[in-house]
Amino acid sequence: VTLPADVKEVFEGWHATDTADAGALADAKRRIEATDAAIANNNLNSKAIPYYYTGKALLGAADWIKGYTDDNYTITGTTRYYSPQFTKYDKDSVGLAYCSDESKAFDKNRKTGKVDKTAVTNKSYVFYNTRMDRNAKGVWQTSMLASVRGSAKCTP
């Protein structure tokens, strides 16, 4: 997965001592990068999306990417991900919650190149709550994903 030069992902504190948690964290990072690469590269058929997503989360990701494509938009800037927290369900499933700071990330019109810069508010911060399940190939796929923009859990 390759991101354009104007799209940056920063992962702060994304370290785990437990092997399973480390694997889930690594695949969550790759899932985020795959989603942004699909949007940035206008690629509705990215093979990385069904690789890192499954179930309802896969449907949600496909809709999210299609929304950008249909509106002729892409992304630009830097998104910071931080405060990852795990909940173990069993050896092959975990909950992963984390925050993102999108205060330096923006939508960009593909046609005009115009960047929609927005003021930094509490809505610039997003709380994510996900479920990840390890498949038969050992890949931690995101099966459920919910987000809350402006959550007090993530705002400074």
Located regions from the model:
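Core segments of small alpha/beta cavity-forming domains
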Residues: T2-T74
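Structured, amphipathic secondary-structure segments that form assembly/contact surfaces
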Residues: L44-T155
